[in-house]
């Protein structure tokens, strides 16, 4: 089971951690580390492939990139990358092709507050695509699903942190 494999791999650690936000947490989730293991990455892509219905997927650099590439290969569908703000090159926030009106599902590694994934969704919507669903490996259950719901997005996690903390 993926949740057990994430814990065994060290992608989910229990202890005392200080998060980027400065908050303390009794667990830490590092899906970027998990995505460097080809077997675990394949397992994650397989789980996403069972859930996703759109014919194109997208994700925010950096954390979602290996996830969307692996899922794209698994499903045989194209993907786009949403970049963080740029001050050089083409300044484009999208890598890949989008068609106005097409439905795109968004993949994220970890959802906490939902702000990061919502930022990616808003960039996609500004480019004329329809986003109704977001998928994540782990939902930390700290308000992200509610924020997305308030913006017309349904969050589909593979694992909820409450399932791991039983």
UniProtKB/Swiss-Prot annotation:
Complex formation: Homodimer.
InterPro entries noted in UniProt: OPRT (IPR023031), Or_phspho_trans_dom (IPR004467), PRibTrfase_dom (IPR000836), PRTase-like (IPR029057)
EC number: 2.4.2.10
GO MF entry, a single one: orotate phosphoribosyltransferase activity
Role of this protein: Catalyzes the transfer of a ribosyl phosphate group from 5-phosphoribose 1-diphosphate to orotate, leading to the formation of orotidine monophosphate (OMP).
Family statement: Belongs to the purine/pyrimidine phosphoribosyltransferase family. PyrE subfamily.
Residues where 5-phospho-alpha-D-ribose 1-diphosphate binds: 83-84, 86, 88, 108-116
Pathway given in the UniProt record: Pyrimidine metabolism; UMP biosynthesis via de novo pathway; UMP from orotate: step 1/2
One Pfam family of this chain: Pribosyltran
Classification via PANTHER family: OROTATE PHOSPHORIBOSYLTRANSFERASE (PTHR19278), URIDINE 5'-MONOPHOSPHATE SYNTHASE (PTHR19278:SF9)
Xref: NCBIfam families: pyrE
Recorded catalytic activity of this chain's protein: orotidine 5'-phosphate + diphosphate = orotate + 5-phospho-alpha-D-ribose 1-diphosphate
Coiled coil: none
Binding site for orotate: 112, 140
GO biological process: 'de novo' UMP biosynthetic process; pyrimidine nucleobase biosynthetic process
Descriptive protein name: Orotate phosphoribosyltransferase
Principal EC category: transferase
Keywords: Glycosyltransferase, Magnesium, Pyrimidine biosynthesis, Transferase
Gene: pyrE
Originating organism: Thermoplasma volcanium (strain ATCC 51530 / DSM 4299 / JCM 9571 / NBRC 15438 / GSS1)
CDD domains: PRTases_typeI
Cofactor dependence: Mg(2+)
Magnesium among keywords: yes
């Amino acid at each position: 089971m993926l949740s057990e494999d994430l814990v065994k791999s060290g992608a989910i650690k229990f202890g005392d951690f200080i998060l980027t936000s400065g908050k303390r947490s009794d667990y830490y989730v590092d899906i970027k580390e998990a995505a460097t293991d080809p077997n675990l990455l394949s397992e994650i892509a397989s789980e996403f492939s069972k859930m996703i219905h759109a014919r194109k997927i997208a994700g925010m650099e950096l954390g979602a990139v290996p996830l969307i590439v692996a899922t794209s290969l698994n499903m045989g569908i194209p993907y786009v990358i949403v970049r963080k703000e740029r001050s050089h090159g083409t300044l484009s926030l999208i890598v890949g092709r989008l068609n106005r009106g097409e439905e795109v599902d968004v993949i994220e590694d970890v959802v906490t507050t939902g702000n990061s994934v919502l930022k990616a969704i808003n960039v996609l919507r500004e480019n004329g695509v329809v986003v109704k669903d977001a998928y994540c490996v782990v939902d930390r259950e700290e308000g992200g699903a509610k924020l997305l719901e308030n913006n017309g997005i349904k969050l589909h996690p593979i694992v909820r942190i409450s399932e791991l903390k039983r």
